[in-house]
Amino acid sequence: MGLFGFGKKEKDKMKDGLEKTRTGFWGNIMNTLTGSKIDDDLYDELEEQLILADVGGEVAIKLVDKLRDRVNEKWLKTGEQASDELRDLIADEMRPEAEMDLSGTPAVILVIGVNGVGKTTSIAKLADFYTRQGKKVMLAAGDTFRAAASEQLEIWADRAGVPLVKAGEGADPAAVIFDTVKSATARGYDLVIADTAGRLHNKANLMAELSKISRSVKKASPEASLETLLVLDAITGQNAISQAREFCKAANATGIILTKLDGTAKGGCVVAVKQRLGLPVRFIGVGEGIDDLIPFTPEGYVEELLPRQWKH
């Protein structure tokens, strides 16, 4: 089993989850490159195909420019050789600078995002994933603004087999998360995963609320580490990224969970996320099941979408 539990099961799930993307626009990219000679027409067509795959104009131009440089540096002649270089360039574009920091006592993951993106189910799936990694996980029902939020999370917590700390509707989210971190610390839990209100905030309110939550985490346990993961819906692609830019800055997000990747043929938005938001994709959702959230690896992603053509 590889890094973060990325073994055969996860590889198979990624393969199945990316089926629409692989046979859609990315299939067109492979067809564009396979059997082609490398010239300006090829670069133009490749740029167009990358944009159609939802990579975004800026990233498409950047990738094609870098590919052109690589082709010239290495004296490459065929589209197959170019596709292998493109594969490596895409993986480089998405590679995180560092792994997630789960070193704290406890580690805390704050999950943020607007309603409808799959935030609550992502929390349950994260809980299931880390439980399978041998960690003791506790959930915090920090979305106290929506009556159904904690009930929904409670159902998922039962499915994942993890405890949930909740309070009544309208309770202070920072207080709920404080209590959860306190409880987790006292009971020797490794990880707290906290839900937050899934509504569109104005920037000032969002910053104030999340800043208060961050302080409450450290107050409850000075040894805690904190990651803030923003959930985005892959089906809305570039639109989701545009809406998320200010949200990310205000929330001081550290990574992305990209859900519903199995429901789109345009999975290229994965490539755009890091460039446009400056944040790495940490997990991808590839199905409805509780074990259908898998850790994202750039290498695994390109392996499925752009299989290596040229044997070096």
Segments predicted by a language model, with ranges:
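Switch/coupling subdomain of P-loop NTPase systems
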Residues: 2, 9-13
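Short beta-alpha junctions and helix-cap segments that line functional grooves
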Residues: 3-5, 98, 126, 242-244, ...
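Surface-exposed, interaction-prone regions with an acidic/low-complexity signature
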Residues: 4, 17, 251
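Primarily NTPase-proximal linker/entry elements flanking Walker-type ATP/GTP-binding cores
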Residues: 15-16, 20-144, 149-185, 189-194
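Conserved catalytic-core segment of NTP-binding enzymes
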Residues: 152, 172-187, 201-310
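Short hydrophobic/aromatic patches at helix-to-coil boundaries
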Residues: 195, 311-312
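Short glycine-rich anion-binding loops that position phosphate/pyrophosphate groups of nucleotides
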Residues: 197-199
